């Protein structure tokens, strides 16, 4: 298990951990099944940064800062992955922009290029703005630390689910070829249940106003984020025929944005009373 965990961290982060000298598909599958737990570690790190920024920027007698802690939280997630997933999102945007005019094969070639085009820059800008804006809203509602934790786990869960047996690689080389179809359905289901359980527990014990209502909100965000990633994955499969490392990165970033949006939602008062949310 330790080898699989180290492999997961070396595949998904730039943390200074010693990974295996060689990663085969079997090991890659076990590592990708642990991707949500990598998200848990990253979420704890980013959540701590959000909380610390709130503390050091607080001004007595004034409303607490929300934008700066949100920017710091999103930045920490980008730094510990060296922008890997954002780069994948940018390449995915360029590939989608080229797909209709140039076809699947040319779009995949464009996704491999090191330069970023207009479509890639635009999609990264919009997704990051959504992440920062939604996280800022959750911070003002005193659930920012919980929100970034849930988003980090759910977005990495999207990568796990994208590597199940039903999803092929889009090309015969690269990260997609290494991990596509390697995660067993049972392991993916267990990962999903584990993320729901951790999200519920985190919501229940949240130091900034935890309780049953917050736990339900966190689980709802996991479900909606996972649903968004499923629909997006199906759409991308129709365009590219499989997954690549860039597609996984794009799924992670967009799922994180969707999860944060759910955590930021204002739920109507009758629904709050019915479900016990706050």
Swiss-Prot record:
Residues annotated as transmembrane: 31-51, 66-86, 115-135, 148-168, 187-207, 215-237, 247-267
Molecular-function GO terms, alphabetical: adenosylcobinamide-GDP ribazoletransferase activity; cobalamin 5'-phosphate synthase activity
Catalytic function, reaction form: alpha-ribazole + adenosylcob(III)inamide-GDP = adenosylcob(III)alamin + GMP + H(+); alpha-ribazole 5'-phosphate + adenosylcob(III)inamide-GDP = adenosylcob(III)alamin 5'-phosphate + GMP + H(+)
Cofactor(s) required, per the database record: Mg(2+)
Subcellular location: Cell membrane
EC number: 2.7.8.26
Keywords on record: Cell membrane, Cobalamin biosynthesis, Magnesium, Membrane, Transferase, Transmembrane, Transmembrane helix
Gene Ontology CC: plasma membrane
GO biological process, one term: cobalamin biosynthetic process
Domain of life: Bacteria
Name the record gives this protein: Adenosylcobinamide-GDP ribazoletransferase
Top-level taxonomy: Bacteria, Bacillati, Actinomycetota, Actinomycetes, Frankiales
Gene that produces this protein: cobS
């Amino acid at each position: 298990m330790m080898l699989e965990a180290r492999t997961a961290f070396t595949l998904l982060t730039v943390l200074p951990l010693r990974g295996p000298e060689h990663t085969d598909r079997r090991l890659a599958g076990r590592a990708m099944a642990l991707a949500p737990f990598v998200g848990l570690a990253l979420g704890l790190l980013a959540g701590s940064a959000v909380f610390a920024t709130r503390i050091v920027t607080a001004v007595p007698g004034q409303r607490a800062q929300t934008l700066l802690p949100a920017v710091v939280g999103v930045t920490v997630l980008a730094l510990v992955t060296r922008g890997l997933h954002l780069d994948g999102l940018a390449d995915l945007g360029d590939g989608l922009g080229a797909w209709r005019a140039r076809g699947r094969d040319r779009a995949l070639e464009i996704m491999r290029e090191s330069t970023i085009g207009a479509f890639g820059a635009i999609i990264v800008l919009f997704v990051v703005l959504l992440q920062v804006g939604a996280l800022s809203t959750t911070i003002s509602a005193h659930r920012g630390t919980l929100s970034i934790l849930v988003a980090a786990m759910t977005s990495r869960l999207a990568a796990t689910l994208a590597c199940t047996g039903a999803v092929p690689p889009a090309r015969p080389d690269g990260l997609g070829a290494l991990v596509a179809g390697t995660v067993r359905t049972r392991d993916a289901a267990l990962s999903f249940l584990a993320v729901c359980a951790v999200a519920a527990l985190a919501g229940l014990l949240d130091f900034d106003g935890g309780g049953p209502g917050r736990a339900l909100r966190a689980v709802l965000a996991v479900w909606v984020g996972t649903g968004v990633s499923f629909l997006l994955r199906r759409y991308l499969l129709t365009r590219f025929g499989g997954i690549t490392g860039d597609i996984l990165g794009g799924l992670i970033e967009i799922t994180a944005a969707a999860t944060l949006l759910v955590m930021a939602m204002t739920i109507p008062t009758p629904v709050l009373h019915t479900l016990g949310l706050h």
